[in-house]
Design a protein with these regions (language model features):
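Short, acidic, metal-binding catalytic loop of nucleotide-sugar glycosyltransferases
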Residues: 20-35, 55-62
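Cell-envelope/extracellular polymer assembly enzymes that use nucleotide-activated donors
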Residues: 3-5, 37, 279
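Catalytic beta-strand/loop signature of glycosyltransferases that borders the donor
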Residues: 127-128, 291-299
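Terminal low-complexity segments of carbohydrate-biosynthetic enzymes
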Residues: 7-13, 20, 38-50, 55-56, ...
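Short beta-strand-to-loop acidic/aromatic patch adjacent to the donor-nucleotide binding site
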Residues: 97, 121-138
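A short, conserved alpha-helix in the catalytic core of glycosyltransferases
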Residues: 255, 261, 272-289
Length: 437
């Protein structure tokens, strides 16, 4: 029986999402005959955790579905064991990269990857706490329908399960490494208010994540494509395309990854940085691995804490760090694009050493572009006034720290890639009595 992991990392109250994802797990087990480990990785406050535990306990028992609700203590205990078994140097440093004190979108997904390895899963299917399913003909529109139909299959064999097949026949023997769709509803990054207040400033703020040297036309295209997902058009009928994955149309709240990818290269463990969990999108695409892009989009909505007070400040700082991370990630993306299929070995497996080397090289990139990004962000936010000008006041004394953190983040990524193979093997070797309950 194929074993898969349906993962829901959360740091906020989302009991309704736990219930909804539980229904998707039950659907997967019944429809595909798979064993589903439903993994709720919970970093929320104690009151929210208690509600999540109650929601998980209230899920109707379904044959083939195993529910794990793990707080940070349980996650830490698992990680300590895996790190210890790996024999890697610097165990405390590795634990910090895997479970930092701060928010890390990459690290929470990396924990799901290692737990999935421990539980014998062949794929990870990730959902998010601030999303819900569309409904059509009285039933929820579950993305796992497309994910389990194709993930991990040889592309030639997956062709029968999609509505369109445009993959170059040269890639027919490679496995489907990624299956995903996007979201409908609000922007995936909480900048919608800026877009409404001042579209010109919105353009300037979003264009800051363009690569160094991008033309004005390239920047305009980037702004038009960024953070909008699949717009607002609701689901009416299935469409699934087998090709290189359309990474602009796949969101981390709606994705399945094959273990042959995530067991070789982790996500960047950057803290307080939005978008740090999209690296494997680029890797799969650039390495010429097949993917399926479908249209079972999830509904994205916002929790109000991002828009006022300390929640607003924290979120805008994560956006600033996202912009700074691009100084180091764009050169890695460029290296991967140039390498193409050379990123794979003869078994169509990704070569992690090439990625680690590229990340290490990019850490030495001149910071001038990031100084410019921060100055431009300051100008834009002061132009908006109000709480945005107040955020600019908050950002000014933090500049040196943020610049240092962005460089340290890419260095940490290289270090984690080096450690990843031993960590995955150590996770697979977790004794039965130490597996997550």
């Amino acid at each position: 029986v194929r074993t898969v992991c349906l993962a829901l990392p959360t740091n906020r109250e989302c009991a309704d999402t736990v219930t909804a994802v539980g229904a998707e797990a039950a659907h997967a087990a019944r429809r595909f005959g798979v064993r589903v480990h439903l993994l709720v990785l919970d970093s929320a406050d104690p009151a929210a955790r208690a509600r999540h535990a109650a929601a998980a306990a209230a899920l109707p028992p379904v044959e083939g579905v195993v529910v794990h609700h793990l707080d940070e203590d349980a996650q830490r205990a698992f990680l300590r064991g895996a790190i210890e078994r790996s024999g890697l140097p610097g165990p405390d440093r590795l634990l910090d990269l895997m479970l930092p004190d701060a928010v890390s979108y990459g690290a929470c997904t990396n924990r799901a990857f290692l737990l999935a390895a421990a539980l014998g899963c062949t794929s990870v299917h990730r959902r998010d706490s601030d999303s819900r399913y569309q409904w059509h003909d009285g039933a929820p529109v579950f993305p796992i329908e497309h994910e389990l139909a194709t993930i991990g299959l040889k592309a030639a064999d997956a062709a029968a399960a999609v509505t369109e097949h445009t993959l170059d026949p040269a890639h027919a023997d490679k496995p489907v490494a990624l299956v995903g769709a996007s979201f409908i509803g609000e922007l995936s990054v909480d900048l919608g208010e800026i877009r409404e207040l001042d579209p010109e400033t919105y353009h300037d703020v979003v264009a800051l994540w363009a690569p160094t040297g991008a033309t004005e036309e390239e920047r305009r295209e980037l702004v038009a494509e960024s953070f909008t997902g699949a717009g607002t058009e609701p689901f009416t009928a299935d469409r699934a395309v087998l090709d290189r994955p359309d990474i602009w149309r796949i969101d981390m709240c709606n994705i399945a990854l094959d273990h042959e990818v995530y067991e070789r290269v982790p996500l960047p463990p950057a803290t307080d940085t939005i978008g740090s969990d999209y690296f494997l999108h680029h890797l799969v695409h650039d390495a010429t691995l097949p993917g399926v892009t479908h249209n079972r989009h999830i509904v994205n909505y916002y929790t109000p804490e991002r828009r006022t007070g300390s929640g607003f400040t924290a979120y805008q700082e994560r956006y600033a760090k996202f912009l700074l991370s691009m100084l180091y990630l764009h050169p890695v993306y460029a290296d991967m694009e140039r390498a193409g299929g050379a990123l794979l070995d003869e078994h169509h497996h990704v070569r992690p050493e090439a990625i680690a080397d590229s990340a290490r090289r990019s850490a030495a990139t001149d910071r001038a572009e990031n100084h410019r990004r921060l100055a431009e962000l300051d100008r834009c936010y002061r132009r908006l006034g109000g709480k945005y000008a107040e955020f600019a006041d908050h950002l000014a004394p933090a500049r040196a720290r943020l610049l240092d953190e962005a460089q340290a983040d890419i260095e940490d990524f290289a270090l984690l890639i080096d450690a990843w193979g031993p960590l995955v093997r150590a996770s697979r070797a977790t004794p039965a009595d130490r597996l997550p309950r």
